[in-house]
């Protein structure tokens, strides 16, 4: 690609009473913005939901694995092709090759001991850990199946305890090539070896409500169906925190970087599927209790050549409650903010929208046509045929 290409995704989504992303106290996450408290859903939470959707969209081998249990993972692949190597030896070879490229490991004895609450609530997990002496990596690492299999193949034929400089370079190369789609999108890092870092091609903002929000509380009781007739009390009582809001969500995808990282994979298809996953995914927190899964009220996508532009400033002044709810005035505020911004700075190359409210500054279409249009635009841009919208729309 000769020119930079950024695809910015702006989404307004109304969510009913829910707790899709909670803090360490079980409360829905919040943020202070524009001097008022807003509902918040972390980018990490939404990226996990996107990756979960990728598992439904892409073949399993094209989606990466995030884990600290790298030794177990690599040892499994070693024994898959070399069953004559026993489990202990496979784990030893896996640890040796991983340490050679910069990974650090903690033995189970070095892991932090669980506190009293954890001892009471996580007995099964602790028992499993106590029976598994394989060390875990110090931090979660993102690895593709192809990379894991490649490094396992090298380790299988290396029974020594050290690697030469050239062998280490070959191992690093194996962990650089063939990244999964989600590694190419979300990036990864390893503190012990900067050569294994992959810069993310997509940026995802924390979603925040367009208006002020106060958390509410549901005092609930559970009935004990099997109790004595004279016992009319509840079997269990508790409190669940929740809120409801219209959220502004933003993500920006650097198509140029994504195309470079993927090295031959159909970049346009990946952009399309990311768009579908970002727009339609939903974090699963407390869904069984609240059934709060919704679809966006407004989707506004722009293509830019200069840089990503987050339009969250449209809601720095919190939307005031009205008889029209929050979604409609939020769409009006987003449209007006974008118009004002484009008068002062450069407007996007092209813009398309789904829903109601942004038709004045973007072409309105159905969701599936929007995905088709975006895919064609990216495909044509990669092929050097301009932005592609003229042919796609």
Give a label for each model feature.
Residues 1-40, 44-393:
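Basic polyanion-binding and macromolecular-assembly surfaces
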């Amino acid at each position: 690609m000769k020119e930079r290409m950024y695809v910015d995704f702006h989404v307004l989504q109304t969510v009913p009473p829910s707790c899709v992303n909670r803090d360490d106290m079980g409360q829905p996450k919040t943020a202070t913005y524009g001097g008022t408290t807003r509902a918040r859903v972390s980018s990490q939470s939404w990226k996990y939901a996107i990756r979960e959707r990728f598992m439904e969209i892409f073949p399993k081998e094209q989606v990466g694995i995030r884990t600290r249990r790298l030794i177990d993972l690599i040892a499994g692949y070693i024994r898959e092709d070399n069953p004559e190597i026993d489990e202990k030896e496979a784990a030893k070879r896996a640890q040796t090759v991983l340490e050679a490229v910069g990974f650090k490991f903690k033995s189970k004895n070095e892991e932090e001991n669980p506190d009293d609450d954890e001892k009471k609530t996580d007995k099964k997990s602790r028992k499993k850990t106590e029976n598994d002496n394989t060390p875990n990596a110090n931090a979660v690492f993102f690895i593709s199946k192809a990379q894991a299999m490649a490094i396992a193949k090298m380790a299988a034929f290396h029974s020594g305890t050290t690697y030469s400089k050239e062998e280490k370079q070959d191992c690093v190369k194996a962990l650089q090539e063939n990244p999964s789609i989600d590694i190419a999108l979300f990036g990864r890092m390893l503190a012990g070896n900067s050569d294994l870092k992959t810069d993310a091609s997509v940026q995802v903002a924390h979603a925040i409500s367009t208006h002020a929000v106060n958390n509410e509380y549901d005092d609930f009781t559970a009935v004990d169906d099997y109790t004595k007739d004279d016992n009319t009390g509840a079997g269990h009582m508790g409190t669940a925190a929740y809120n409801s809001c219209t959220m502004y969500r933003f993500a920006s995808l650097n198509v140029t970087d994504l195309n470079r990282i993927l090295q031959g994979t159909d970049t346009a298809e990946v952009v399309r599927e990311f768009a579908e996953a970002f727009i339609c995914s939903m974090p699963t927190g407390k869904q069984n209790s609240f059934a709060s899964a919704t679809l966006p009220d407004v989707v506004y996508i722009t293509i830019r050549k200069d840089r990503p532009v987050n339009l969250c400033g449209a809601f720095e002044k919190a939307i005031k409650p009205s008889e029209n709810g929050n979604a409609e005035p939020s769409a009006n505020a987003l449209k007006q903010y974008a118009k004002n911004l484009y008068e002062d700075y450069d407007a996007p190359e092209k813009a398309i929208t789904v829903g109601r409210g942004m038709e004045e500054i973007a072409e309105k279409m159905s969701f599936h046509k929007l995905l088709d249009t975006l895919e064609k635009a990216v495909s044509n841009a990669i092929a050097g045929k301009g932005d592609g919208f003229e042919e796609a729309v």
